[in-house]
Amino acid sequence: MKNKRSQNSPYVTPDNPYLTLEKALGYSFKDKRLLEQALTHKSCKLALNNERLEFLGDAVLGLVIGELLYHKFYQYDEGKLSKLRASIVSAHGFTKLAKAIALQDYLRVSSSEEISKGREKPSILSSAFEALMAGVYLEAGLAKVRKIIQNLLNRAYKRLDLEHLFMDYKTALQELTQAQFCVIPTYQLLQEKGPDHHKEFEMALYIQDKMYATAKGKSKKEAEQQCAYQALQKLKEAK
C-alpha cells in the first residue's frame, strides 16, 4: 500500500531532479524554470542566468537577517548588530548556509568553471544562494524566506552570537584567500607590551606579502581575529 503522505508530497514528481534540494530547503518551487534560473551561473552563456535574482536576493536576505537579529539580540547596540549581520550577510556566511543544503551539487556552471572547481567558490555559491532565496521570495513571499533562513541558521551554526561568529573570521578569511589567490594569510607580531597580567598584542596580517590589516588584542589570537575581520571587509569592498 502506498504511503498517502508521500503520494501527496509537493516534492514527489517523477521528473524532478531537484527533489533532494527542495526537501533540504523545505520548499517546493511551483515554477521549476525559476529554480533552474537561480542555479544557473553566467558562465553558462544561457539566455537566463541568476544575476538579476542575485540582486534581489541580496536585498531580501539583508532585510530578513537584519530583522531576525534585531528581535533575537535585543540587548545588542547598533554596532554589535552590524557586526553580526556582516558575518552572515557575506560570501562566507551565505556559502555556509548554501552548503547546509548541498547547493553546490545542483549549480549549473560552464565546463571551464567545472574544471576550476567553480561550484565550490564562495563567490559563485553565495550568489546562487541569494538567487535561490529571491526565487522563494517571488513565489511564496517574505514569511517563507524568513522561515527557511531561521531553519538554516539553526542548522549551520551551533551558536549564533557575536563571540561565536567572531571566532570564525580566521577560517572565513583562509577559505576566501585560498579560493581567490591560492594562498593562506600570514600573521606577524608587531608589538607586545604591558605587564604579564595585562598584556596587549599588536598583530599584522599579510596576503601575498601585502599588509591588509593591523589590530590589537589581549591575546595574539584575539588580535589575529580582529585582523581577519578587517581583511574580510576590505576584500568584500574590493569585489
Curated annotation (Swiss-Prot):
The keyword RNA-binding applies. InterPro entries: dsRBD_dom, RNase_III, RNase_III_dom, RNase_III_sf. SMART domains: DSRM (SM00358), RIBOc (SM00535). GO terms for cellular component: cytoplasm. SUPFAM superfamilies: dsRNA-binding domain-like (SSF54768), RNase III domain-like (SSF69065). It comes from the Bacteria. It catalyses: Endonucleolytic cleavage to 5'-phosphomonoester. Residues 168-237 form the DRBM domain. GO terms for molecular function: double-stranded RNA binding; metal ion binding; ribonuclease III activity; rRNA binding. One of its GO terms (biological process) is mRNA processing. It is an enzyme of class 3 (hydrolase). The keyword Nuclease applies. The active site is at D58, E130. PROSITE patterns: DS_RBD (PS50137), RNASE_3_1 (PS00517), RNASE_3_2 (PS50142). Its EC number is 3.1.26.3. Its cofactor is Mg(2+). Keywords: Cytoplasm, Endonuclease, Hydrolase, Magnesium, Metal-binding, mRNA processing, Nuclease, RNA-binding, rRNA processing, rRNA-binding, tRNA processing. Residues 18-141 form the RNase III domain. Mg(2+) binds at E54, S127, E130. Digests double-stranded RNA. Involved in the processing of primary rRNA transcript to yield the immediate precursors to the large and small rRNAs (23S and 16S). Processes some mRNAs, and tRNAs when they are encoded in the rRNA operon. Processes pre-crRNA and tracrRNA of type II CRISPR loci if present in the organism. Homodimer. Belongs to the ribonuclease III family. This is Ribonuclease 3. It comes from Helicobacter pylori (strain J99 / ATCC 700824).
